[in-house]
Amino acid sequence: MKCHHAWKGARLFDFINQRVKVVEGSGLFINLIDIDSLAVINAFLFNYGQQENVKTKTVALLNIGSAFSNLNILESGVPRLSRDIHIGGSNITQRIADATGENFKVAEELKINSAIKKAKDFAAASDLVLSNLASEVRTSFDYYESQSASSVEKIFLSGWGSLLAGLKEKLSSYI
């Protein structure tokens, strides 16, 4: 079992080294390599860390990516809970593909165009995915609140998936 973990670590190291060589080959210098969750937290705190509602309150950062979403709960700017949720924009795209009979690429274009035009055509296709995502977020909030004296007061959304038409309203109603 230990060899398996060492092999995973070696593959990850090789993967990172390949990316570093590409970046450095373009004349840029890498100062820091971060994991997704910490990168979102660092970017958020850099931009909003001095705001009173971030410095003194408990907030959640929900980064909705393609394959998965990251949820981070910060209490007075300090990370208290971080987890990956294996639901992302591609799940919505697949539901649209299933509903329309189109291939994944066409469904992705339909999803992107509906986000830009704020069309409601794909609400039914996205509802199940969004309710599952909201359920995972709510479960995380419940766990955090059972371990802490505070509760999440505000959610900040990021990631391409956060641009989906009606997402904020649906998450608000589910959570």
Where are these regions (language model features)?
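Hydrophobic/aromatic-enriched cytosolic interaction surfaces used to assemble or bind macromolecules
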Residues: 1-175
